[in-house]
């Protein structure tokens, strides 16, 4: 399963580990993804999403129905 937030689209980015001696080695910065069940009152069921912490804040602010409509509009499976 890919490490991408279903709400924001955030995914891994690359960068460097930098040691005290300033040696650089490549690394990946992973998004803070969580599997979370959201209750959708209009459908009378739970929906399980893989969302980042930022995605959860967006759902709290805008509402699960609006966010689900956008995910479905963009072709996401929910």
Swiss-Prot record:
Pfam families assigned: Ribosomal_L28
GO function terms (MF aspect): structural constituent of ribosome
InterPro entries, per database record: Ribosomal_bL28, Ribosomal_bL28/bL31-like_sf, Ribosomal_bL28_bact-type, Ribosomal_bL28_sf
Gene Ontology CC: cytosolic large ribosomal subunit
The UniProt record lists the keyword Ribosomal protein: yes
GO biological process: translation
Region spans: Disordered: 1-20
Keywords for the protein's UniProt record, in alphabetical order: Ribonucleoprotein, Ribosomal protein
Matches recorded under Gene3D superfamilies: Ribosomal protein L28/L24
Similarity comment: Belongs to the bacterial ribosomal protein bL28 family.
Protein name, per record: Large ribosomal subunit protein bL28
């Amino acid at each position: 399963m890919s490490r991408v937030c279903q709400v924001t689209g955030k995914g891994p980015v690359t960068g460097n580990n930098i040691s005290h001696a300033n040696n650089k080695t490549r690394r990946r910065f992973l998004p803070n993804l969580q599997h979370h069940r959201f209750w959708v009152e209009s459908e009378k069921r739970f929906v399980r999403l893989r969302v980042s912490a930022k995605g959860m804040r967006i759902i709290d602010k805008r509402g699960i129905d609006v966010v689900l409509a956008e995910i479905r509009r963009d072709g996401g499976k929910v």
